[in-house]
Amino acid sequence: IVLMLIGVVVVYKILSVVYKENWDKNLSSDVSFSNKTATKGDKIDIIETVVNAKKLPVFCMNVKFDIDRSFIFGQNDTNSMVSDKTYRNDVFSLLSNQKVTRRIAVECSRRGVFRLSAVEMVFPGAFMNEIMIHRSRLYSDITVFPKPADVKSLTDVNNMIMGELERRKYLSEDKFVFAGIRDYQSYDSVRDINWKAYARTGNLMVNHYNETVSRNVCLLLNLESEAAYMQEDVVEYAISIAAGLSQLLIARGVNVSLISNGRDIDTKQNTRIEAGSGLSHFNQINTKLARIDISQDMEEFAQLMTSLNEECTMMAYAGSSRSDMIYVIISANKNDRIRKAAGSIMNNQNNKIWIVPRVNSGIGSMYYENV
């Protein structure tokens, strides 16, 4: 019996030392996002990969990491604890020379840039009576785009913008350069209907002429709250309106630019996107909107518009097409300084468009403010 006890002690000591010295050798873990980009409301996977590239098995090990609490795990999840962040703790058991990969489904519940920075492997020892930790860095991130506001809610503002573009087109298009015919739209003038085409096809068609100015719309996005405290739901809905309106206008072939006092999460600079069109430009706008960090101090919006107006005045003297820009303001804050600056920058517009976002009981809506 004594010899058996001595043998047990010797085996215990040997295994304890062997595992203590070698448990994390050729043992690695990685946690990453399945996508580089997503849109708010999308479901993605968090991928956990653990590799044991040695003969010594690791029968029980915990892999721990933290992630922003906006990522929602499934209702049946029991391996996460939510406080300031979501803390994840998963148990792995690996044989010799084994790789284990798990995919955990999560929902992206808010816009932003999110990063995984570190992972811990925690080993309780060969006999579950010790705690050994191996930390390593992670380099995975995801950009979650804002969910565009519903197209139906943007119908009125779209008609106002297209009406302003048509008004300017008639002031600038060359009636001697016929470009073709197209389907009639609600904002088209009766004088441009091609009656011969209507008689032939039975569908209303309008003449289309070459224009001497571009179709440019600039969205001015103010993220200053009107109240003393940050109305985060209203600010986020304003960003969604900017995304939805950009998507709608770009789909109609309009060049869209965007200027905001919302600052980039890394550069800390105001958000500014020059005019462009197409899917790649919409993705650029989405990326810029996703990168806005509303916790940072913001430039006063009235001052931003005043500086922009001075810049546009100088460009107009230089003959730049920027002088033909149509401005659309998205701002819940309606103080007198903003009103004055808005009146100046939209002085040449027949339709002065100011969208005021609001949120009631979690549901976003908007109305239009007079300038």
Each PLM stretch: what is its role?
Residues 1-6:
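Hydrophobic alpha-helical transmembrane segments
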Residues 155, 186, 190-371:
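Exposed, interaction-prone extracellular/peripheral surfaces
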Residues 10-269:
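An amphipathic, basic-hydrophobic helix/alpha-beta surface used to engage anionic
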